[in-house]
């Protein structure tokens, strides 16, 4: 159990309590005032606004935000203010994929070399202070100082939690996954359903096998650079030493941000990495992108509902554990990206929706054995948007029962007032608006109703806590 640092105790009077927030992220809305009105009409109260920085080489110290036009952020902040909506400003970083050395990696793998780490923090500090000044000027309700920087924010390493490094270094394990995927793709093509299974990686590779081999090479090189590829004990020691530097860097940066912006500050950890962030006590809330697996492939409707309840309960317990600083100090939790596609099976691996995958499947499993797998071709999958409605309803039910008292807010990924976004963005949820191209559908309306219900529950919970704290 961690205790808050003394400097943060001194700042407590300056930082407002993280508010309940129920909202989402839009998809290139052309009319922000109409978008804000639509959001309010759906019973939601928060807009998530994003700013972007660019990371050059994954192992370098160059972080730049010169391509981020401040006016693009400001116009969204002003529209939300006009509508009386709450605002969460999120700093995101994208990895420059035009650089060959970054191929097959993502921003969660950003990991500057030891001799570049100080430069990285100096550059990222400028980005964070730029965002903090905007947050202060526009009275943003919550400022998210970074998002999904897995390798840069893993500062604690339980003995059993060295993955993904071990996985990338294990040629036998990566080959097994590769063979499963290639076999799945071959089966799809053999039955005549694989028109989308060509032009791998923009045509750079002739086959999925070649693409996956190249990806394994890149990720193994990344893991070798990060860990030194020594023994487990050597890797553990190396990661812990690096983690100490990262922890100090983030705490100093957060202190600097607080000198500019006096509202609540959090960070957006990935759903599979939040437990490795060791500096939650320096922040005002735990933030997480919420793509947690909730079900298994092939479950009946009854099995699926039971699995959703059990999975959300486990997620709530784990997040609450990370948010617990001491017996009387539990940080609020925000689900910064909460969403599923409209396809059947979207709650098995919410991040998976393209080409082919092999998904964990319902079945009898002996102790110690792996869950059976099923080949899934996403382009052949039928739509089942009610599945995501049920997933959100299960979360709302858990909150209603008192099973996730730490939850303070969520942002749906992604909302739109334009029905044509349904074709290009599988996560899209259509928000009814007074525009001619709007065609509300029952499943999106039902999902928004559950979102509004969850938002109301979170506001009621926050009110109860305020009354209790005044006694």
Where are these regions (language model features)?
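Short, acidic/polar
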Residues: 27-41, 121-134, 270-277, 389-399
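Short, well-ordered coil/turn segments that N-cap beta-strands
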Residues: 18-23, 43-45, 81-87, 139-141, ...
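Hydrophobic h-region of N-terminal signal peptides that target proteins for export
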Residues: 8-16
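Substrate-binding cleft and catalytic face of glycoside hydrolase catalytic domains
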Residues: 42-60, 72-214, 220-227, 231, ...
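The substrate-binding groove and active-site-proximal loops of carbohydrate-active enzymes
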Residues: 24-26, 57-70, 109-125, 149, ...
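Aromatic-rich peripheral "rim/lid" segments of glycoside hydrolase catalytic domains that contact
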Residues: 162-199, 204-206, 351-352, 377-393, ...
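Glycoside hydrolase catalytic-domain groove-lining segments
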Residues: 70, 75-76, 90, 227-255, ...
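Boundary/entry segment of secreted carbohydrate-active catalytic domains
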Residues: 15-44, 50
């Amino acid at each position: 159990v961690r205790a808050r640092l003394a400097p943060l105790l001194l700042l407590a009077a300056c930082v407002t309590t993280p508010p309940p927030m129920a909202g989402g992220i839009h998809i290139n809305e052309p009319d922000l005032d109409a978008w804000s009105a639509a959001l309010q009409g759906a019973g939601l109260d928060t807009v998530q606004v994003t700013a972007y920085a660019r990371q050059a080489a994954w192992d370098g110290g160059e972080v730049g935000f010169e391509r981020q036009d401040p006016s693009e952020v400001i116009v969204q902040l002003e529209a939300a203010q006009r509508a009386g909506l709450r605002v969460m400003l999120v700093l995101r970083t994208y990895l420059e994929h035009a650089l060959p050395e970054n191929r097959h990696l993502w921003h969660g793998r950003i990991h500057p070399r030891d001799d570049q780490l100080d430069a990285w923090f100096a550059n990222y500090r400028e980005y964070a202070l730029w965002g903090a000044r905007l947050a202060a000027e526009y009275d943003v309700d919550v400022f998210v100082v970074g998002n999904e920087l897995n390798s840069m924010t893993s500062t604690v390493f339980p003995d059993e939690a060295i993955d993904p490094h071990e996985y990338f270094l294990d040629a036998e394990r990566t080959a097994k996954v590769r063979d499963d995927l290639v076999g799945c793709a071959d089966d799809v093509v053999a039955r005549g359903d694989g028109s989308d299974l060509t032009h791998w990686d923009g045509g750079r590779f002739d086959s999925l096998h070649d693409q996956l081999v190249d990806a394994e090479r890149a990720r193994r090189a990344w893991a070798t650079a990060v860990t030194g590829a020594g023994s487990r004990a050597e890797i553990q020691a190396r990661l812990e030493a690096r983690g100490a530097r990262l922890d100090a860097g983030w705490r100093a940066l957060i202190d600097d941000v607080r000198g500019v912006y006096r509202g609540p500050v959090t960070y957006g950890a990935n759903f599979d990495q939040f437990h490795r962030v060791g500096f939650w006590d320096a922040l005002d809330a735990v933030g997480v992108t919420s793509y947690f697996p909730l079900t298994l492939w092939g479950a009946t409707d009854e099995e699926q509902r039971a699995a959703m309840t059990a999975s959300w309960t486990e997620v709530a317990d784990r997040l609450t554990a990370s948010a617990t600083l001491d017996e009387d100090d539990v940080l609020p939790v925000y689900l910064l990206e909460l969403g599923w596609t409209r396809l059947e099976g979207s709650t098995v691996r919410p991040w998976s929706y393209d080409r082919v995958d092999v998904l964990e499947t319902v079945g009898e499993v002996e102790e110690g054995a792996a869950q059976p797998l099923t080949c899934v071709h996403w382009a052949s999958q039928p739509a089942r948007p009610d599945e995501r409605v049920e997933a959100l309803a299960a979360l709302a039910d858990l909150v209603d029962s008192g099973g996730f008292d730490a939850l303070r807010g969520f942002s749906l990924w992604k909302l739109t007032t334009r029905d044509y976004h349904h074709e290009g963005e599988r996560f899209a949820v259509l928000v009814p608006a007074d525009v001619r191209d709007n065609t509300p559908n029952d499943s999106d309306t039902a999902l928004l109703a559950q979102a509004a219900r969850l938002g109301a529950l979170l506001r009621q919970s926050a009110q109860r806590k305020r009354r209790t704290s005044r006694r």
